[in-house]
Amino acid sequence: MKQVCVLGNGQLGRMLRQAGEPLGIAVWPVGLDAEPAAVPFQQSVITAEIERWPETALTRELARHPAFVNRDVFPIIADRLTQKQLFDKLHLPTAPWQLLADRSEWPAVFDRLGELAIVKRRTGGYDGRGQWRLRADETEQLPAECYGECIVEQGINFSGEVSLVGARGFDGSTVFYPLTHNLHQDGILRTSVAFPQANAQQQAQAEEMLSAIMQELGYVGVMAMECFVTPQGLLINELAPRVHNSGHWTQNGASISQFELHLRAITDLPLPQPVVNNPSVMINLIGSDVNYDWLKLPLVHLHWYDKEVRPGRKVGHLNLTDSDTSRLTATLEALIPLLPPKYASGVIWAQSKFG
């Protein structure tokens, strides 16, 4: 039996474990503070559900492990500075940017990037945390410790957000899912919609970009690339060197889920192109209690993470998939009264994708 240790024991590790069971792969999600002696890592392939981690007894051991897949890639992608430098090196389109070293640079920043600046911490920060949208009269809002530790990007006037989830094997082969349409609110992914056939031009551009990134890094496994949709084409926003929230729909909407695909890649199992036959919707459950009335609707698949419910915390998601978009739309309509009011706008956005 193959064994995989996942650095991190959140919902992504949980879903990797679930995906491993039918394949006969024992997946062990482990917390960062676990005692090395209690973790069967010596005979395992090592992967991670997070991009960066503090130094602990366990992470020191894993850092030396020869089967830690992508060990040298994580630091590059975890730092937005080196991530942006990678895009520039490969001549891939991304928002104009620079390192923000000192507050005296602001006049030149706005001269170069325009009236809206997006400031992001180089490391850490997710779901909208560690980011600021600033205009010239708002720069005092930025904490002093951010200078030298943040990049600043041009605010992009985009018409939509999409992500591409793909995987690369040890032999250099790559496979991709169709582009996923995403709705973010307050920096947090709320809803995703995927179709069997994405916009051909966007799909081709996205696959070319993500393939170039994975090949340059020698990356193995699933990677996600978030993009802005603009009249000039796709602009890369950020990368995630792991399974990704916007790929959760693949659990019920694809022949191979992103979690199984990642395990196949890192354990050197066959990596065929996943088949997607029907449209799918994913709704993130954020800071809301479980409601089993959702399951009265036959298209709804509930994925509950068994975490303590707290405001702003991802505690589960709902997947819906069907060949009949009218049935999907009707099911989404029936979900609205079963969800807290804050979900209505995301559900209506998903319905709008079906015309």
Each predicted region: which residue ranges?
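Short, low-complexity Ser/Thr-rich regulatory SLiMs
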Residues: G166-F170, C227-P231, D306
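ATP-binding N-terminal substructure of ATP-dependent carboxylate-amine bond-forming enzymes
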Residues: M1-Q85, S104
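A short linear hydrophobic-aromatic micro-motif
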Residues: P96, L116-V119, E149-E153, M223-A224, ...
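Conserved protein kinase catalytic/activation segment
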Residues: G233-L235
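Active-site "cap" helix and flanking loop/linker of ATP-utilizing ligase/carboxylase catalytic domains
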Residues: A204-M225, T230, P241-S288
